[in-house]
Design a protein with these regions (language model features):
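Short, well-ordered beta-strand micro-motif
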Residues: 11, 78-82, 98-101
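Conserved N-terminal beta-strand and adjoining loop/helix that marks the start
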Residues: 1-18
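Structural motif
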Residues: 18, 74-78, 97
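Nudix hydrolase/Nudix homology domain
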Residues: 27-29, 93-146
Length: 146
């Protein structure tokens, strides 16, 4: 069995809010990130994805969570990242980016991404390992279209 891999960034500002980007292809907010390409390590992918999606240069601080969507044969790496440069901007994938307090997320935030941000905010020294049971982002998009 081969797993597809994704890598997402949890980026906190000085007030403890988390950066989310708004997708162009659907009306949802998500953590910046995406697929790990062939020949790329997950920590390299998250740095590339953040730069491409929201214009920020980041440095990976730690692996906060590892999530295995068994039914999808997918593994998601969630990294806490620190901004080292760049400026928030839009892209082909993102039409907005903003920091949100975890208790004041937009109603149209992907459930799985909100959960990853909350896990990272716990600040646990060990990586959180989870098999998610809620709806995937794809399922949320289908439900919102129906």
């Amino acid at each position: 069995m081969r797993f597809a891999a994704g890598a997402y960034a949890v980026i906190f500002d000085e007030a403890g809010r988390v950066l989310f980007s708004h997708r162009r292809d659907c009306d949802f907010w998500n953590l910046p990130g995406g697929g790990v390409e062939s020949g790329e390590a997950p920590w390299q992918a998250v740095v590339r994805e953040v730069r491409e999606e929201v214009g920020l240069a980041v440095e990976v601080e730690r692996l906060a969570g590892l999530y295995s969507w068994l039914a999808l044969d997918e593994v998601i790496y969630s990294f806490v990242c620190r901004v080292t440069g760049g400026a928030l901007s839009t892209s082909d994938e993102s039409d907005d980016a903003s920091y949100f307090a975890l208790d004041a997320l937009a109603a149209n935030t992907f459930i799985e991404h909100a959960a990853r941000a909350r896990d990272a905010a716990l600040g646990q020294p060990q990586t959180i390992l989870r098999i998610p049971t809620g709806p995937t982002g794809r399922e949320q998009m289908r439900q919102s279209d129906g």
